[in-house]
Amino acid sequence: MAVPYSLRALDDFQTRSAARHLAQRIASARLDAIRRSTAHGLRFVPESSDYTLTAVADGNGNGVRTTELVSGVDRVLSEPERIGTHFGGVSFGFHEGVPDADGNAAGSLDGVRIGASRLLVMNADGTASSGTLYLRGRGRSQYAVRVLGVTGRVRVLRFDAIRNRWFDV
């Protein structure tokens, strides 16, 4: 009996740690944007059934843009990384039957909900592009990292399957 519980607890710990790590990366990008007076952010690139994330920065004063990242005008600041590399069994996405953080049916299992460009940008004035990033563990652990655009505030949420609701961590 103790082994399944321990595995669930470990899965939840890994997923929660990944969510906090991601929230910290976003907060760090926001701080860099304010400190350097230029837009910084994270770029999410689909790769097989998951995403890689890369730190990026504006290179010409008009914000971070995908075409400018490809052409080299905007800068890539880090190597692409998979969240599961640091937090085993964790990936972007939804578990079957889990609603989004607004309580609506998820529709798709895609866990990166930040717009078609897949860029989460923090601006020099402290604002950000809005969106929610969903992380799932091996078991039933489900967390979300939500960015509020006007304030740039970052929240970590946990899905409680028994109550079928999201709660702030």
Q: Which residues are covered by each model-predicted region?
A:
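N-terminal helix-rich module
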Residues: M1-Q24, L31, A39, F44-V169
